[in-house]
């Protein structure tokens, strides 16, 4: 498809030609119309003859060849516990949708999470870092604590909601603090993620350890920000973490310190922050989110009910008990395939263990015990 007209606006993520908005990622070629046509007196197709001003406007126009399907924003809510409701699989799915539109898409992760499992964050960070090579990731942050904050820092841009909190990327093992050596490895990993996003490495240590310092000074003229890992005692220095607490940023702090790209409380405001003409959600991220959350709820409910049934099998004969146990364990195997994260957190025997348990019960049935 070719679009002709006067170039009205050239924004960061799109061009506006006449009244048509075209995303930069959609543009294949741009041709200047400064040179006269073969017959400058011949009116343009569909235009009345003698309309010189219209012809002159067409002469000054640019012609852009674009794909017929205009891409936009791919929105994915990410809420709940990191490693359970919030996981990398949905990121993979939304990227697959974006890939169909070509490179250069904008993927918005709407993050509302108090944290969770570190290993799952590592998988999510690796997923985001890999796909950032061809798409832009935006973290739209409300509550982003611990592993959720680290996920946001893996994105190219961070936009805060007014009630946002981001930080406190602490590590624990079964509720207990981890060793200093483990924390240092975690800090090194976080620094690497920050580099891929273009953020200062100064953020890593004070968000992980409460015995660290981060402050900054913003140049009032240029807006440039300089970060410090120790007190400077200079005019304008703003302290965010002071040796006694993990760094947790509010919306005001995130924006003023330069970590956040802007602030938005709804999708229309977010579109403006991202320099988009309007909000245009082209993916099915909301459905992905809702489907997975519903699966987690159904899984937990079913495990609770079937576990209760196991405790009430005493009223049946031994042969019936064996069959009902096999039925329940096979049901659990199906849930392992549908919701492995939930099954792990619920402490259900692994697939291998269940298969061995089923095999043993089937052997007892064959031998006719009971």
Language-model region placement:
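Charged, glycine-interspersed solvent-exposed loop segments at helix/strand-loop junctions
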Residues: 172-289
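STAS-typified acidic loop motif
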Residues: 64-90
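Conserved RNA-binding domains used in RNP assembly and mRNA/RNA metabolism
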Residues: 1-56
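Second-shell loop/turn segments in exported
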Residues: 75-85, 108-115, 138-142, 171-181, ...
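Intrinsically disordered, low-complexity segments enriched in small/flexible residues
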Residues: 33-63, 200-205, 209-229, 271-370
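A short, well-ordered alpha-helical element
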Residues: 84-105
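Soluble non-cytosolic domains of exported or imported proteins
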Residues: 21-24, 81-89, 115-122, 143-146, ...
């Amino acid at each position: 498809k070719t679009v002709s007209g006067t170039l009205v606006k050239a924004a960061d993520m799109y061009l506006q030609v006449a009244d048509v908005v075209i995303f930069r990622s959609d543009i294949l070629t741009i041709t200047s119309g400064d040179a006269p046509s073969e017959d400058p007196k011949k009116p343009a197709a569909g235009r009345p003859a003698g309309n010189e001003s219209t012809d002159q406007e067409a002469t000054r126009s640019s012609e852009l060849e674009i794909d017929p399907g205009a891409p936009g924003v791919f929105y994915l809510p990410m809420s709940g516990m990191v490693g359970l409701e919030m996981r990398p699989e949905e990121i993979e799915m939304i990227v697959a949708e974006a890939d169909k539109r070509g490179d250069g898409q904008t993927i918005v992760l709407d993050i509302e999470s108090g944290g969770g499992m570190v290993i799952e964050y590592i998988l999510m960070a690796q997923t985001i870092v890999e796909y950032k090579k061809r798409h832009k990731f935006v973290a739209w942050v409300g509550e982003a604590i611990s592993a959720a904050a680290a996920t946001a820092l893996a994105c190219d841009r961070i936009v805060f909601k007014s009630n946002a909190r981001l930080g406190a990327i602490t590590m624990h093992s079964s509720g207990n603090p981890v060793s200093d050596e483990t924390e240092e490895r975690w800090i090194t990993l976080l620094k690497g993620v920050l580099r891929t996003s273009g953020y200062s490495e100064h953020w890593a240590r004070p968000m992980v350890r409460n015995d660290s310092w981060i402050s900054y000074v913003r140049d009032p003229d240029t807006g440039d920000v300089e970060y410090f890992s120790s007190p400077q005692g200079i005019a304008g220095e703003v302290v965010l973490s002071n040796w006694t607490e993990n760094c947790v940023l509010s919306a005001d702090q995130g924006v003023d310190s330069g970590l956040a790209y802007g602030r938005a409380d709804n999708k229309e405001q977010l579109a403006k922050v991202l320099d988009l003409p309007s909000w245009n959600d082209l993916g099915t991220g909301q459905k992905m989110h809702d489907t997975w959350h519903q699966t987690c709820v159904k899984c937990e409910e079913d495990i609770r009910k079937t576990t209760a049934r196991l405790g009430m099998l005493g009223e049946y004969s031994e042969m019936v008990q064996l069959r009902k146990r096999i039925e329940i364990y096979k049901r659990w195997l199906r849930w392992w395939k549908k919701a492995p994260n939930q099954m792990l957190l619920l402490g259900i025997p692994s697939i291998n263990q269940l298969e061995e348990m089923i095999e043993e019960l089937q052997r007892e049935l064959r031998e006719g015990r009971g």
